[in-house]
Amino acid sequence: MGPAVLLAILCLGVAEVTQSSDPSLDSEWQEWKRKFNKNYSMEEEGQKRAVWEENMKLVKQHNIEYDQGKKNFTMDVNAFGDMTGEEYRKMLTDIPVPNFRKKKSIHQPIAGYLPKFVDWRKRGCVTPVKNQGTCNSCWAFSAAGAIEGQMFRKTGKLVPLSTQNLVDCSRLEGNFGCFKGSTFLALKYVWKNRGLEAESTYPYKGTDGHCRYHPERSAARITSFSFVSNSEKDLMRAVATIGPISVGIDARHKSFRLYREGIYYEPKCSSNIINHSVLVVGYGYEGKESDGNKYWLIKNSHGEQWGMNGYMKLARGRNNHCGIASYAVYPRV
């Protein structure tokens, strides 16, 4: 087959896909590509457009149901709008809830009054939202965020810590860099290593690299770490009395990937399957407390264009929704 014939076949394939697309969405497609800096090859354009249109229709129908009072949150065709579910799931990492958690220190709840609203951002404990990119490093961002909060409470200084340090250097503890990892093993590394560098001295690259940790540049240390028992009440107490807590959740669903704002509740979410690490930075409720619209405030690592400027309100008090309390851990400094 000659080059000219092959090119003609390729062009014909792209033309057929383009012709099947909805022309009324042309301007929205071009604007979306500009907004998220998307550039495709001639072969990719049609396939990505088809996926994007499917997601666009899903989002519009969901938001109609939100306007009708059938949903509690809205969705948006964000940077993941051209991804299939299979492609997005490759960005997640299966995180088995370890059997050894019973042998490790378990947070002992402190009795007493708990505030109805907590938001550690307002107390200066939380660094800006970051973007993990295509590296499966959510576990590193979650662990670093928990340490940042504790270091701030101890020193009064908020220092962004190096997630790349964790990606590159915690393999001996059992993490696998950009392939997969866990917050527990990340904290174990910092504890054994007796230090973690700052983002300023060990910046994030979003790819696997050789460990370049220098003890003299350490910006944080931890003395131990503890799990929170598998209970939303205990997690609530830990968030209120200790600070931002690292947790794992089930984030496999399109509704999570394309979340925009509101209190996220996904009936298909599992409380036993954990595949994404985030940081709980607070909790509260919308409307009247008696309305039952309670939420966890979580910080994600998909950039500020995802969700509520990088954050999500996830349903609280709904039977450990999405496993929010199944894998909660925090450091001591």
Swiss-Prot record:
The keyword Heme does not apply. The active site is at C138, H276, N300. GO terms for molecular function: cysteine-type peptidase activity; peptidase activity. Its EC number is 3.4.22.-. CDD domains: Peptidase_C1A (cd02248). One of its GO terms (cellular component) is endosome. The keyword Glycoprotein applies. It is found in: Secreted; Lysosome; Endosome. Glycans are attached at N39, N72. Expressed in placenta. Highly expressed in a subset of trophoblast giant cells in the parietal yolk sac and at the outside of the ectoplacental cone. Expressed at highest level in liver with lesser amounts in testis, kidney, heart, lung and brain. Not detected in spleen and skeletal muscle. Not detected in blood, heart, brain, testis, liver, lung, kidney, thymus or uterus. GO terms for biological process: blood vessel remodeling; protein catabolic process; proteolysis; trophoblast giant cell differentiation. InterPro entries: Papain-like_cys_pep_sf, Pept_his_AS, Peptidase_C1A, Peptidase_C1A_C, Peptidase_C1A_papain-like, Prot_inhib_I29. Residues 21-113 form a propeptide. SMART domains: Inhibitor_I29 (SM00848), Pept_C1 (SM00645). Residues 1-20 form the signal peptide. SUPFAM superfamilies: Cysteine proteinases (SSF54001). Keywords: Disulfide bond, Endosome, Glycoprotein, Hydrolase, Lysosome, Protease, Secreted, Signal, Thiol protease, Zymogen. Disulfide bonds join C135-C178, C169-C211, C269-C322. It comes from the Eukaryota. Probable protease. In placenta, plays a role in promoting giant cell differentiation. Also plays a role in placental spiral artery remodeling by direct degradation of smooth muscle alpha-actin. Belongs to the peptidase C1 family. This is Cathepsin 8. It comes from Mus musculus.
